[in-house]
Every structure is written in C-alpha cells, then in structure tokens.
Amino acid sequence: MRLSQMLFVTLRDDPADAEIPSHKLLVRAGFIRRLGSGLYAYLPLIWRVLEKVKRIVQEEMNRTGAQECLLPQLQPSELWKMSGRWDTYTESEGIMFALRDRLERELGLGPTHEEVITAIAKEMIRSYRQLPVNLYQIQTKFRDEIRPRFGLMRGREFIMKDAYSFHSDEASLKATYGAMDQAYRNIFSRCGLDFRPVDADSGAIGGSGSQEFMVLADAGEDEILYTEDGLYSANVEKAVSLAPDAKPSPFSGYKKQSAPNTATIAKMCQCLDCDASNVVKNVLYQAVYNSGKAVLVLVSIRGDQEVNEVKLTNELTKLAPHYESTNILSLTVPDEKEQQKWAAKPLPLGYISPGISDDYIATNKQVADKFLRLVDQTAVDLTNFATGADAVDYHVTGANWSTDFTLPKLVVDVRKALAGDRPVHDPTGELKTARGIEVGHIFQLGTKYSQAMGATFTNEQGEEKPLVMGCYGIGVSRLAQAAVEQSYDKDGIIWPTAIAPYEVVIVVPNVGDEEQMQVAEQIYTEFQAAEVDVLLDDRNERAGVKFKDSELIGIPYRVVTGKSLKQGQLEVVKRADKSVQNLAIAAVVPTLTAWIKAEKKTS
C-alpha cells in the first residue's frame, strides 16, 4: 500500500476525551475516530490489525474442531425471558439495547448469544450421536454502557468472538473447556501479548466455573491477585485467601459502653482502645430480586475486612428461589431516603448489632419482613469482640456468639481478598497484585440455559437429558487496543509483529530524488513478492514528518532510502528498540523476511 493513496491523518495533540495511553495513541495515529459516546469508526490501519487478530482466532478455533457461523444481532425478548435474563440485562445491569418493532414486539441488540444458540440447538440437536459440537462467530456486539470510556476498551459496540459448545455430559464439557483454554493461550501468545489466565466470577453469564485471560497493563480496570509460585491467580472479584490473624482481644465480659460520635470503625477502635480485628461490623444492604421483592441484608464481618459485593451477590442469588425469584436486580447500601420507605423507626447506623430486631422493618408487601442475616467466616472465629449496641453512641464489648448473639445460619465467604493476604494453598506465602485488561473469558455453563429453555437430547439409554453447555469469548477489538496499552513508548505504538497493520514501512526522505524512489519501488515490489505486508511512504512530506509518523503508527521495521544509499546500503530501524543497521540493498528483503517469519513463529 502507498501511503499517498491511504486515508491517513495523524494528530499532534492528545484527544481531550482520552484517558489512557492506548486510547490517545490510536486516535492520534489515525487508527480510530470517535463518532459519539462509546462509538468509534475502525479506519484502514486498525482494520488490518483486527483482520490479523481474527485470522489467528479462526485458525486456533478451527484447529479444535469448532465451526464458524453467524447469528442474528437482533434477538427476540421471548428467548431471554425463557432464560430469566431479560430483566437482568434490561433493568438490573441495563446493558442491553432494547427496542420495539412496528408490531410492538420486544427485541434486544445482542450483548451475547447464549439464548439464541440454545434455541437453535433445541431444534437441531436430538441425539448424543450429534455431540459434542462447538459453534463460534466473530461479529459486532452491543452494550449500553453507563459510562463508555477508554476507546475500544469499553465501548457501546465492539467486535467479539463468542463460541458455544454442547455436550452429553460434564466430562465432555471439561474436555472442550480444556481445549478452549489451550486455544486461548495459543491465540494470545501468537498475538504477542503478555497475559495471565485467572480464576473469575461467572457474573450474569452463570455456570459452575470460569476463567479470564488478562493482558497485564498498568491501565487495566481489573485487579489480579496471584502467587509468585504460579499456582494461584484470580480476579479480585473471585479471589480467596486466608485473612490475617486477629489481634488478641483486650475485652473480657459483656459490657455496654458509651462511645459518642464513633459511627466508623476507626473512631470506634480509637475510643475503645482496640484493633479493628477485634470488631464485628454489621453492614446493611438492600437487595431487590426480579420478583420485585426487596430484602434487607445484614452482613456481619470482621472489622478490618471489606465485603466483596460480587461474592455477596452470588450468595444472594442462590437464595433467590426463597423470594420467588431467579436473580437480583440491584444490591445497594440504602441511604436515608431509601430507608424511609421501609423503616418502622430510624436505624442506629454505625451502631447496628448482629442481633438487631426485625421490628425495625415496617409492614410492606414489597419488603421482606425479616433481615436476611449472613456472617463471614472471619467474624465467626472471633471471641470477646466489640460490636454495635443498636443504640446511637453505644457499642458493646466482650461479646460472644451463642451467649450474647445468635450466630446466623448462613456462614459465607464474602470478604474481599487483598494483596499481602496469605494464599490458601501456602499459608507461608503472600498474594501479589497486578492490573489487567480482560481479553478473554471461558465458562462451564452446565445446564443453566438448556434446562430453562428445554433444550434436550436423547442419551445412549434412550433417556431425555438437558444439553450440557460451555461458552467462550474473546474481545477482538479490545485485544487490539490492549496490545497497544502493553507496548508503546513516548513516540508512539509498538505493534507486535504478528498483528501489526504492516510489517515494514519504506520511507523515502526525498520523493524528488530519482534514485531514492527507484530503489524504494524496487524493494517495495520485492517485499510484496515475499508476501511481507509493506507500506511505502511516498508522500511529498519532510523526512522528519515521515519518521515521526512511522514511529507513531508503530510498524515493526522501517527501511530508509537515505544517505547510506550512496554506499549501496539502506538504513533499517527496528521500532521496538530503535536499533539501526545498514544492510546491502540486495540483503534487505531476505533479511527482514527472515526476521519477521522468526518473530511470528516465536510469538
């Protein structure tokens, strides 16, 4: 491609709305252009990157036996109502673009396709002889993000590869799950990324187990906890650990104490002269289930620990059937205005005890009449602890479970694991932290969707059984930007060779110099014959502008038909480290072709 013929415009300054380096660079280098909030045009350079990523994805997916297809972006609401996710996606998380057609039929623009593929499997898969089968697609998805940001990282439309597998049993699912795990490792390695697979929460997708693939980058939105021995890594939403040991309690004997203006743990501990690990704090939440029922949730946890709301949501989702529901629409800490809707009398906020009376809840059909009480294991283990006294400006000390407070029946792990905690598998070790960008996620769905939607098959014994499912996603457009976030310098992007828009750029310092142009045209033709992706900068611009642009767009190798031409040589600059070599004209194409081939093989 000749740069003089390309739609190519670079910017000197960073765009005002860009917050992270990769977003700034992709806009400045002319790869993407913003059209609206979370909406970007993929311009020719980034499209070449995306096509290369897609090709790698297709090759690795096809190698596993998966079959490519294309599913509709518009999806009937009936399918989502069958699975129980319509309310979650349109009201709770609110991430689905929902609309009505001219006949008032409800439709959604697909953020994901579990319902669609399950409906197809229900009609087409009848027998165990058709299993296992794995279908995938690469296409545009939609999410009505509350706050689109970071360019392609969190947009309202994005390109994704999603695959769905169907099986006769869990053993078959696990085999495909393992194959997808390896395929994903191959994909991200071939794309030249530094990544880490981590245990993850399944979220609204559901299922029994899942794993994320994180590209390590300081600007990553996700926190990862891991051990240096390589035996454990998890998204902080999912991570488990051993809490630090509690300090010895300074209290003995149950006592109610006056403690004015101590509604926070810090002030309470200062007043009572104790450590936060000697305290049972009681955090009040309001959960609203999809039946419309609101439930007041009281979580008792050790005072020096924090509640992981993802873990809490998962625990509350398990209890949904008790409230004639299937999932949670919202989980919030109720403010004073919200409390007025259900409180029979003002709550002693900051001084609540584990045994606070249910009488605080007024009679209301939309609100459960009792607190749902959960206790984290860190609080269960405490003795002679301090906690609220259910009276403003008062706490109790020297309290114990059974004798002073009834231990809740629901003992759970809802604490947030932290860097510095001890790993479960090695109490002598320590969890480290890193930031990551999620580029892939694989799930063992089990029978969640097939049971809800009646997708069954006949097994070898002639019995009708629900299909066992897995699903596997890769954010293709996000991956492209993640590569930039992981590899750039003060001058611009440094693309991994395997997904660079072009592998070589030929810069002609003076297009009016006949010899420079002649040699440039010659090696341009030779690179094309060698099947190297080559870009010829034949613009009538100053040499300095061309050099700056070549560094900004991040092409792995730059060949310059400049001063060394008089010695029968060309200057070759490697973008990654800016090393410079002068090679004989005849050696340039075979040498760079070999380098590029080797880099693709080892990436």
Swiss-Prot record:
InterPro entries attached to this UniProt entry: aa-tRNA-synt_IIb, aa-tRNA-synth_II, aa-tRNA-synth_II/BPL/LPL, Anticodon-bd, Anticodon-bd_dom_sf, Pro-tRNA-ligase_IIa, Pro-tRNA-synth_IIa_bac-type, Pro-tRNA-Synthase_IIa_type1
EC code(s) of this entry: 6.1.1.15
CDD domains, A to Z: ProRS-INS, ProRS_anticodon_short, ProRS_core_prok
Matching PROSITE patterns: AA_TRNA_LIGASE_II (PS50862)
GO CC terms: cytosol
GO molecular function, one term: proline-tRNA ligase activity
Superkingdom as given in the UniProt entry: Bacteria
Keywords for the protein's UniProt record, in alphabetical order: Aminoacyl-tRNA synthetase, ATP-binding, Cytoplasm, Ligase, Nucleotide-binding, Protein biosynthesis
Enzyme class, UniProt record, top EC level: ligase
Chemical reaction(s) catalysed: tRNA(Pro) + L-proline + ATP = L-prolyl-tRNA(Pro) + AMP + diphosphate
Compartments (UniProt record): Cytoplasm
Subunit structure, interactors included: Homodimer.
Known function: Catalyzes the attachment of proline to tRNA(Pro) in a two-step reaction: proline is first activated by ATP to form Pro-AMP and then transferred to the acceptor end of tRNA(Pro). As ProRS can inadvertently accommodate and process non-cognate amino acids such as alanine and cysteine, to avoid such errors it has two additional distinct editing activities against alanine. One activity is designated as 'pretransfer' editing and involves the tRNA(Pro)-independent hydrolysis of activated Ala-AMP.
Comment block on domains: Consists of three domains: the N-terminal catalytic domain, the editing domain and the C-terminal anticodon-binding domain.
Stated name of the protein: Proline--tRNA ligase
